[in-house]
Regions:
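GTPase G-domain guanine-specificity segment
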Residues: 45-100
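Switch/connector loops and helix/strand junctions flanking conserved nucleotide-binding motifs
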Residues: 21-22, 47-56, 116-120, 185-186
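Conserved catalytic network of the ASCE P-loop NTPase/AAA+ motor domain
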Residues: 2-6, 29-35, 100-102, 141
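Conserved catalytic-core segments of large NTP-driven translation/proteostasis enzymes
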Residues: 93-186
Length: 186
């Protein structure tokens, strides 16, 4: 919820073998409520039974090299995902069939493990970002304001904060103040 509440754009990663799960619905509701543009990464295509992986290859190149029954299996899994989104009121299709990206959510089949489809995922993300955020992306002067997503201890670095700065700038060695449970932390 924390990341979804401040995100300008999102990639919703779905395990193509499992389809929609409980957390998928939760994420979709957050994105819908915030009107956050997003695309869907249908991950783990390399785990579809019979899939022959071609590492770091665009999906559009590895897909035609698969046996027909494997392509049909993957298509059915993707259309199950598309159907679930359609029932929630979204216009959605596989990225290579989308005609109007402004009004249609794109599904990009990919594998984080083998790198297949990452090329198309980045292309769609860049296009979506340019389309939806062109007027919103700007640098503002002044003190940084942001949202802390996570606080953790990193070996060699010490205490680290993962944040999203949404206003102003933050410079190296600059003093920051974070709201703590009982009092501000400097």
């Amino acid at each position: 919820k924390r990341g979804g509440s401040v995100a300008d754009i999102a990639i919703l990663v779905i395990n193509v073998l499992r389809g929609f799960e409980a957390q998928t619905f939760e994420c979709v509701e957050i994105l819908k409520a915030r009107k956050t543009p997003f695309l869907v990464a249908a991950n783990m295509i390399d785990r579809v039974p019979g899939w022959n992986s071609y590492p770091d290859t665009p999906f559009s190149k590895s897909y035609p090299l698969q046996d027909p029954y494997v392509r049909e299996d993957l298509d059915n899994r993707i259309y199950d995902v598309i159907g679930a989104f359609s029932r929630l009121g979204f216009k959605i299709d596989r990225f290579d069939k989308v005609r109007e990206f402004a009004s249609t959510v794109a599904v990009v089949p990919m594998s984080a493990k083998t790198g297949e489809g990452i090329h198309e995922l980045l292309m769609v993300l860049i296009g979506l970002t340019q389309q939806h955020l062109k007027k919103r992306l700007q640098t503002t002067e002044g003190p940084a304001k942001g949202t802390v997503l996570e606080v953790k201890e990193d070996p060699g670095l010490g205490l680290t904060l993962n944040t999203i700065i949404y206003d102003g700038t933050l410079q190296k060695n600059e003093l920051i103040v974070v709201g703590g449970k009982e009092k501000p932390i400097v």
